[in-house]
Amino acid sequence: MLRALARPLERCLGSRASGDGLLWQSELRPHAGGDYSIAVVQANSRLEDQSQVFTSSSATYVGVYDGHGGPEASRFVNRHLFPYMHKFAREHGGLSVDVIKKAFKETEEEFCGMVKRSLPMKPQMATVGSCCLVGAISNDTLYVANLGDSRAVLGSVVSGVDSNKGAVAERLSTDHNVAVEEVRKEVKALNPDDSQIVLYTRGVWRIKGIIQVSRSIGDVYLKKPEYYRDPIFQRHGNPIPLRRPAMTAEPSIIVRKLKPQDLFLIFASDGLWEHLSDETAVEIVLKHPRTGIARRLVRAALEEAAKKREMRYGDIKKIAKGIRRHFHDDISVIVVYLDQNKTSSSNSKLVKQGGITAPPDIYSLHSDEAEQRRLLNVLY
């Protein structure tokens, strides 16, 4: 009886995936151009990944925000970025590259302002940041914007070839990670007089020996040299000597018209891509049913993480959050199907304004319903 009563709520808010108390999913939902599936697995003591999808009859917004140093920055982006995009799109007559850049800039500036105000009480906020991956589909045009190393991958078929025979994986985002030689060169070029700007420590390249990503929301102490001289931050924070910003919040943005051979998009935090290649992820989506496909990708990544430790997936599921971070990162996945025949006005009108925000912490069992209502009121 109780299980039957719970099913409608799970269809609305999403549910824990069977067998893993730290894995949450929403199996399949409609958007104006097809369906989407979302799943999250928690590894950290506090979930640092945040993710969301909002839909209307004319547009679909997708966001994956991979926090570091704590969840504050990713939660902030989760609350503010989409409302800014919607506000500026209305002011400028629709979505555009400039609208997206303006929304990112406003979100960054507002977060930095909050950090400055909270510095006397919470100086550690200056060390919190978040990668930021956004996808937006409007009028058959796709926008992908990102900061950091979350990734968007397109699965498509070659024109005239049966999709059952395979799909091509195309990476749409740029990894802003100093593990990539071109990114290291970019960071060094912006800091030519700092021989310590990129260091190889603990087996990987890091900016100032601390962080791998070169672009983010937040990480104020690596963007604003004045924090090094601030007495409060010197006493209670982690002052890093800087001559100029070591990181930026300038997103990489691509724009493309969707084509009939474009089948689906995969948006995911780097916790997924650490274990699965672009090609493997696309193959999994292509060969399996839609329902629960995001969870299937998460499970595939966890199985790979288990193999690396000579364990089984069942063993990983038993590990508590916090300790589990030693085996894998938080992972967020959103799969968006692109059904060209559903983009007609008659079909898109059937899609209600709405969407879903993943839980701020999987332990809470459900998405933040009040926060979701607040965002919907702002957006619509």
Swiss-Prot record:
Binding site for Mn(2+) 1: D66, G67
Catalytic activity field: O-phospho-L-seryl-[protein] + H2O = L-seryl-[protein] + phosphate; O-phospho-L-threonyl-[protein] + H2O = L-threonyl-[protein] + phosphate
Entry keywords, A to Z: Hydrolase, Magnesium, Manganese, Metal-binding, Protein phosphatase
Cofactor(s) the protein needs: Mg(2+); Mn(2+)
Sites where the protein binds Mn(2+) 2: D66, D270, D329
Top-level taxon of origin: Eukaryota
SUPFAM superfamilies named among the record's database cross-references: PP2C-like
Entries under Gene3D superfamilies matching the protein: PPM-type phosphatase domain
Pfam family for this entry, one: PP2C
GO molecular function (one): protein serine/threonine phosphatase activity
InterPro entries, per database record: PP2C, PP2C_BS, PPM-type-like_dom_sf, PPM-type_phosphatase-like_dom
CDD domains listed in its UniProt record: PP2Cc
Cofactor: record remark: Binds 2 magnesium or manganese ions per subunit.
Phenotype upon loss of function: Plants missing PP2C42/PP2C-D2, PP2C64/PP2C-D5, PP2C79/PP2C-D7, PP2C63/PP2C-D8 and PP2C68/PP2C-D9 exhibit an increased hypocotyl length, as well as an enhanced sensitivity to LiCl and media acidification.
Domain PPM-type phosphatase residues, every copy: 35-338
Protein EC: 3.1.3.16
Keyword Manganese attributed: yes
Family assignment from sequence similarity: Belongs to the PP2C family.
Function as written in the Swiss-Prot or TrEMBL entry: May dephosphorylate and repress plasma membrane H(+)-ATPases (PM H(+)-ATPases, e.g. AHA1 and AHA2), thus influencing negatively plant growth and fitness.
Protein name: Probable protein phosphatase 2C 63
Organism of this sequence: Arabidopsis thaliana (Mouse-ear cress)
